């Protein structure tokens, strides 16, 4: 069996790099989706709390009492921001998937072409 050409080795390395980037994007997306669910759950719980109840919110490393409406608004704003990030990551994921499939096809074609004897047509 012949050695793999430097061009194919480079394509394989690029394929692995794209795969790692896709995994990173999917991991971030999963993390953001989990944060969105947590925010929505907290918002639902706050809606069930009586208006006069004390509500606290983390501000940096300190917990401060805030009006219920402000805490709910803050949760909604954060969830919306996270949803935008998720959409952005989904676009990146689609682009990476297309790039991955293209590189994969190129590598497969190069490997099959390199192992095939020339056809006399």
Swiss-Prot record:
Localization annotation: Cytoplasm
InterPro entries, per the entry: PFD_beta-like, PfdB, Prefoldin
Keyword Protease: no
Pfam entry (one): Prefoldin_2
UniProt entry tagged with the keyword Chaperone: yes
Keywords: Chaperone, Cytoplasm
Main location: cytoplasm
GO molecular function annotation: protein folding chaperone; unfolded protein binding
GO cellular component: cytoplasm; prefoldin complex
Binding partners and assembly: Heterohexamer of two alpha and four beta subunits.
HAMAP family: PfdB (MF_00307)
Functional description taken from the UniProt entry: Molecular chaperone capable of stabilizing a range of proteins. Seems to fulfill an ATP-independent, HSP70-like function in archaeal de novo protein folding.
Family: Belongs to the prefoldin subunit beta family.
Name under which the protein is recorded: Prefoldin subunit beta
Species of the source: Methanosphaerula palustris (strain ATCC BAA-1556 / DSM 19958 / E1-9c)
Gene: pfdB
